[in-house]
């Protein structure tokens, strides 16, 4: 098979079942090889192994479209899937970017019109009661940028864990406290005036997606994104159902995916949403989502973490952005370096990821 350099033409990896990523061949891909200090890169991975090989994890490094390095700890394989926790939020953001584009194109069911300034609660049926009058001012943009005023981590509201006799979406909508006694019925501020990392706010986006698109978000993403870029083995949790609201796609956590397949998403974003001849995700949405979405926390775009002002990762490129989840599940994208770095795992909660990326960049010019 003829090897294709992504620097000279548009290269996109086939699905894993059909060969997957092209590995860097030191004898053939001399142009790319000349840019990489393999001795230093190997040292970076060895140091990582020394500290973190006691937990299940995987690392994939893609440069110029080639898989230049990967590492898996004990009992972990290239196909091993991990719950990437809040990286899921960025997938929700991608889904909403597609929904907004469909609105622009007039292809939503019943030609519904939606934009970032649309009031979220205007799409809920009357049966969804509003627990705080101020919620009528919450926009789609507020939900995607964590500025809705719906209680989140600042108020010790983590996830959407329900009581035994209520569902998770009942808690997210403010109808019932969670199993730890925390409530979301009242906003902590007027929408757009405070930044708070809120899982209940993200849960709103799942219900709204179904109401507007008439499809569950995970089903839509499978067709519109996953199938097109060769993601074959990812799965997405759903919440609720039975006598409770739902079941609906989990918007804040619950995507299970391998390091290699998560790297496909990073590569898609690095290519401004293009995959081969198909614009899978609108480039205009990627541009908007990977820049600060508001001034309250300029390190947060629309569901992506960003470095536009050089404050999130000082000393690293300002075009760098990431998908981030608990247990340091990460997908870093640096378009100016044509670099994607993925780390998936079951821990630790924190590590010096900034130093790790700096050392990877030192090895890859």
Show the residue positions of the predicted features.
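Active-site-proximal binding-pocket segments
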Residues: 221-222, 226-291
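N-terminal leader/targeting segments and the immediately adjacent pre-domain N-terminus
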Residues: 1-77, 101-113, 215, 361-365
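Active-site Gly/Thr loop motif
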Residues: 232-233, 238, 291-340
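Active-site-proximal alpha-helical segments within enzyme catalytic domains
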Residues: 201-208, 253-275, 329-345
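Catalytic-site signature segments of enzymes, centered on catalytic residues
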Residues: 72, 78-79, 154-242, 248-253
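Structured C-terminal helix/loop/strand segments within mature extracytoplasmic catalytic/sensor domains
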Residues: 323-365
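Active-site SXXK
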Residues: 65, 83-116, 143, 205-209, ...
């Amino acid at each position: 098979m003829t090897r294709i350099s992504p620097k000279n033409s548009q290269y996109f990896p086939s699905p894993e079942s059909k060969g997957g990523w092209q590995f860097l061949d030191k004898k053939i891909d001399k142009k790319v090889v000349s840019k990489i200090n393999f001795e230093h890169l190997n040292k970076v991975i060895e140091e990582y192994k020394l500290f973190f090989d006691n937990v299940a994890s995987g690392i994939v490094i893609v440069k110029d479209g080639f898989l230049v390095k990967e590492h898996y700890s004990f009992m972990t394989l290239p196909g091993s899937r991990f719950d990437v926790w809040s990286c899921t939020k960025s997938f929700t953001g991608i889904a909403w970017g597609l929904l907004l584009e469909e609105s622009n194109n007039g292809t939503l069911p019943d030609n519904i019109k939606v934009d970032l300034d649309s009031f979220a609660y205007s799409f809920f049926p009357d049966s969804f009661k509003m627990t705080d009058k101020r919620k009528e001012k919450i926009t789609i943009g507020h939900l995607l940028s964590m500025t809705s005023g719906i209680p989140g981590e600042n108020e010790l509201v983590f996830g959407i864990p329900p009581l035994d006799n209520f569902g998770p979406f009942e808690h997210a909508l403010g109808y019932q406290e969670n199993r730890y006694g925390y409530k979301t019925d009242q906003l902590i501020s007027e929408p757009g005036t405070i930044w708070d990392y809120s899982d209940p706010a993200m849960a709103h986006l799942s219900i709204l997606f179904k109401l507007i698109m008439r499809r569950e978000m995970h089903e839509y993403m499978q067709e519109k994104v996953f199938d097109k870029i060769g993601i074959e083995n990812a799965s997405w949790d759903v919440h609720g159902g039975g006598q409770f609201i739902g079941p609906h796609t989990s918007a804040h956590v619950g995507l299970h995916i391998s390091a290699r397949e998560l790297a496909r998403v990073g590569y898609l974003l690095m290519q401004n949403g293009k995959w081969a001849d198909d614009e899978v995700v609108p480039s205009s949405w990627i541009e908007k989502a990977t820049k600060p979405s508001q001034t309250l926390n300029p390190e947060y775009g629309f569901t992506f973490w960003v470095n536009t002002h050089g404050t999130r990762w000082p000393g690293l490129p300002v075009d760098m952005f990431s998908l981030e989840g608990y247990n340091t599940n990460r997908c870093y994208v640096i378009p100016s370096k044509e670099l994607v770095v993925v780390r998936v795992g079951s821990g630790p909660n924190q590590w010096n990821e900034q130093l790790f990326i700096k050392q990877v960049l030192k090895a890859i010019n």
